[in-house]
Amino acid sequence: FPHQLYQLYTAQPIETKPYRTEIYCRKLSSDLRWLEAVARKDADPRLVTIPGLGDAMKDLLKVFSPRHYFDAQSLSDLRPGLVDLWQIVRSYTDRLSGVYRETQFRNGIIKRSRYSLIGDRLSTASHILFLCYGNINRSAVAHALAEKRIPDAGQYFFKSAGFHPLGNRPADPRMAAIAAAEGVSMDHLRSSVLTTELTEWADIIFVMEADHVKQLSTFSQAAADKALLLGGLLADQSATEIPDPYNKSQPVYQSVYRTIDQCISGLSKLVC
């Protein structure tokens, strides 16, 4: 091709060779990403048809066909292929390191949210903040349950908030209906946006997910250090994260309500 460019530039007749047909060019890194996406089913089935893993493997085995060529790996020039392989190894190494760090972080949050340790923290706490993303489902129902289940003796004060930037929203009607059926009213609650003042007010911040601790750290490390998983109040098991039910099925809403109800019962046993 460079020689043809030279011929074109110097107005010489361009020498061409017949094109080979039915030749397929592949890229190893793209093939590996595709195989991983198929194995994970990492696509919206409404938009694409996800092949079976067997079909994907059959397609990958075509690399041994003489009609299939890698665009980077070539015996005539090893350098592009080696660069591509290095980028593949570095990409997977970075991802595995990230997964390891994330696992260690989550395990640390779970460890410090053990039921017995929460009891120790509560002995010196009076201001308790419940926190989730929107403050219309999980933290809101925890707030309502805590106000109902834990006697107001002036020792404990409860608030709730969320990371969602829009405040003053009523509780999710579906969660409010489930709570009302159990004799718990959420009608008086309106969502609050988390502020630095709220993080400073709280002695303990009960979060629903480990990622909420990361978000808290953007306010201050002191705020993140106050965070515990609400799921740590399940006395008969290790601390667990509580998923967001928003826009999910009714059974998910009911399951989340039951879990939070059990957590507040655990809190009540520790403080009453």
Task: Show where each model-derived region lies.
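Conserved metal-phosphate-binding beta-hairpin within the catalytic cores
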Residues: F1
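Peripheral (often C-terminal) accessory segments that flank ATP-dependent C-N-forming ligase machineries
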Residues: Q7-E102
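Short clusters of hydrophobic/aromatic residues that line enzyme substrate/ligand-binding pockets
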Residues: C25, M186, L194, I242, ...
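Phosphate-binding/catalytic loops
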Residues: Y100-L122, A210, K214-C272
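Conserved active-site segments centered on acidic
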Residues: F105-W201, C272
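Short beta-strand scaffold positions
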Residues: F130, V207-M208
